[in-house]
Amino acid sequence: MGIQGGSVLFGLLLALAVFCHSGHSLQCYNCPNPTTNCKTAINCSSGFDTCLIARAGLQVYNQCWKFANCNFNDISTLLKESELQYFCCKEDLCNEQLENGGTSLSEKTVLLLVTPLLAAAWCLHP
């Protein structure tokens, strides 16, 4: 196979890698009825690209969600809760509740929060 044939093969493989996916869907804990210890994991349906954990007082909701709808208005409307805290994440089973009642933050999320602060501190340092 010459250089041209190798380039065509490489292009074809690259196109397949970009346009085909393995079929892996996001896994989230899913307990749409409030519970304090959700352990039911499901594969999210197509179009649901985010895991959600929402807390309204003692009520805790875990489910698959759409990232585009990860905002207070959409979540509070669907759950019919006027005051709540929520967290959306995009890794498998990332919407698990911690023992102390908090939500687990992934290492990447923490890094995304801390990095700009460190950069700002570095720039402001005389």
Swiss-Prot record:
One of its GO terms (cellular component) is plasma membrane. Glycans are attached at N43. Transmembrane segments: none annotated. The keyword S-adenosyl-L-methionine does not apply. It holds the Pfam family CD59. Disulfide bonds join C28-C51, C31-C38, C44-C64, C70-C88, C89-C94. GO terms for molecular function: complement binding. GO terms for biological process: negative regulation of activation of membrane attack complex. Keywords: Cell membrane, Disulfide bond, Glycoprotein, GPI-anchor, Lipoprotein, Membrane, Secreted, Signal. Residues 101-126 form a propeptide. Residues 1-25 form the signal peptide. A lipid is attached at N100 (GPI-anchor amidated asparagine). Residues 26-106 form the UPAR/Ly6 domain. It is found in: Cell membrane; Secreted. The keyword Membrane applies. PANTHER family: CD59 GLYCOPROTEIN. Potent inhibitor of the complement membrane attack complex (MAC) action, which protects self-cells from damage during complement activation. Acts by binding to the beta-haipins of C8 (C8A and C8B) components of the assembling MAC, forming an intermolecular beta-sheet that prevents incorporation of the multiple copies of C9 required for complete formation of the osmolytic pore. Interacts with T-cell surface antigen CD2. This is CD59 glycoprotein. It comes from Papio sp.
